Regions:
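Short beta-rich binding modules
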Residues: 1-301
């Protein structure tokens, strides 16, 4: 199976993480990684393009976008809950103020240094596109022309990771300062060679690499997609009637059913008659510490 841009076979004309300190974080610097998850975000509307030199704005056509993740295989962290200890999963998309930017997934015509379209050459992924840079880093340059980014899955590379710390001005229940840590992907490079001129060993993934598209999505796949990305997917122009819509609706329905079942069970426990006990002498009540509920519930996995 392959996953290519929608316009890979289209007629062509050459006429001119936020993480907040409440979640575990990896080490910064150059980290060994493998591409672990590709998520189809569908056809997304895009904001107008503004020319930095002239200030002129031009409308941009909607285009297919994706999100790409890599697991840092030397950075095992404890996410807690049902996830437990896993390799740190790093989002490669750009993020700003908590908002995620989709990666444009489309072919573009080749241009010269002056921006003029070159006739007779094949359309490819954009030279500055993250997927183009990844294809070079994993030594699979054919992906740039074929557009089959599913070939990136499980490929090893070196991820440049930036970890920034900021004091929140708050304290936890132990009186310790809460430090916010923002994790950002800054680029990629090839795995370096060892003394025998062979690529250094990169550990395998803990979980199988996946490519979740609007065509192959299943309800069980949706648990791997972050809520913010699900919200983006729901805004896609081609979401309605897609297999992705069906999978998300079934997944969310199963979550709601599980929550309703848990609520009913808790209510039944509360309604059970309690055995009366002899009255005890009043004792001084010790105030329980207030739990920290400041997490936004958007797990980084």
């Amino acid at each position: 199976m392959s996953f290519k841009p929608k316009n890979s076979n289209a007629p062509r004309s050459n006429n001119s993480g936020e993480n907040t300190g409440l979640f575990p974080v990896p080490k910064g610097g150059s980290r060994k990684a493998r591409v672990s998850l590709i998520v189809d975000l569908g056809e997304q509307n895009r904001p107008d393009f503004e020319d930095e030199k002239t200030g002129e704005t031009k409308p941009q056509k909607p285009c297919q976008q994706v999100a790409i993740f890599a697991d840092l295989v030397n950075d095992t962290v404890d996410y807690g809950g049902t996830i437990g200890k896993q390799h740190y999963r790093l989002l490669l998309n750009k993020q700003f103020a908590g908002e995620i930017t989709g990666i444009n997934f489309m072919f573009v015509p080749p241009k010269d240094a002056k921006g003029k379209i070159i006739d007779g050459k094949p359309w490819t992924l954009h030279p500055a596109n993250l997927m183009t840079k990844l294809a070079k880093a994993v030594n699979k340059p054919d992906i740039i022309e074929s557009g089959d980014i599913e070939q990136l899955l499980d490929c090893p590379f070196m991820a440049q990771v930036e970890v920034k710390e900021k004091d929140s001005g708050k304290q936890n229940d132990k009186g310790e300062p809460i430090i916010y840590r923002n994790v950002n992907y800054k680029g990629c490079s090839e795995v370096p060679l060892d003394d025998d001129d062979e690529p250094m060993q990169v550990a395998e993934l803990n979980t199988p690499a996946q490519c979740i598209t609007f065509q192959n999505a299943k309800p069980d796949d949706i648990k791997f997609i972050r809520k913010k990305l699900i919200d983006m997917i729901k805004l896609a122009n081609d979401y309605s009637g897609s297999n992705m819509e069906k999978a998300i609706k079934e997944y969310e329905a199963s979550l709601n059913a599980a929550n309703d079942s848990n609520s009913e069970q808790e209510q039944q426990e509360e309604e059970k008659p309690q055995a009366t006990k002899p009255a005890k002498k009043p004792t001084k009540k010790v105030q329980e510490p207030t739990p920290d509920d400041s997490e936004d519930g958007n797990e980084p996995w």
